[in-house]
Regions:
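A sequence-composition feature that detects small, non-aromatic residues
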Residues: 14, 23-26, 64-67, 96, ...
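Short, charged surface segments at domain edges that flank catalytic/cofactor-binding sites
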Residues: 28-91, 103-113
């Protein structure tokens, strides 16, 4: 796995994640729609496409919306973090983040694009996870909050493995 391919994978998958967040925040979301985890096992899907040698897996907009709705439109790092109100639906702006990055899907038999692996974050925390020097602190917190839910979906990852996906 070359450095260039790793860099390309990060860039291409980041673009997919940005497009997902743009799509979910541009649409009107019904706040009253409550989502419950179902623990149905979902096998890894075929890749959406291969671009520039990078395998890209589809992100399901509805699953991201469900995850954000389940958090009651709050940041899962700190529910007191404030966000602006969206024009589209009057709800707080939140971003969906796959705790185990979709770029790692090839390592897992079951889909990573499930609500149990998608966390709701304010822009500040989402950017800190991707670019902050203390991102490992935030990732560790989310890991401990989500590990049991992930296991129910047969998604097994150690904290050390997860941190390595983020470059720690």
């Amino acid at each position: 796995y070359s450095k260039k391919l790793k860099k390309d994978s990060k860039r291409v998958n980041a673009k997919e994640d940005d497009e997902l967040n743009e799509a979910i925040n541009a649409n009107k979301i019904q706040k009253n729609k409550y989502f419950n985890y179902c623990h149905e096992l979902i096998l890894r899907q075929e890749p959406k496409e291969i671009r520039q040698g990078v395998t890209v897996y589809k992100r399901d907009k509805q699953k991201a919306i469900n995850a954000i709705s389940h958090s009651n439109f709050q940041c899962e790092i700190n529910p007191d973090h404030l966000s602006f109100v969206k024009k589209s639906d009057g709800l707080p702006y939140m971003e969906a983040h796959h705790l185990i990055p979709m770029a790692q899907q090839d390592l897992f038999e079951y889909s990573l694009d499930v609500e149990e692996n998608i966390v709701s974050l304010c822009s500040q925390c989402h950017n800190e996870i991707h670019y902050g020097e203390n991102a490992d602190r935030l990732i560790t917190k989310l890991y401990h909050e989500r590990i049991e839910l992930l296991k129910k979906k047969k998604i097994y990852v150690s904290l050390e493995e997860l941190l390595s996906y983020y470059g720690f």
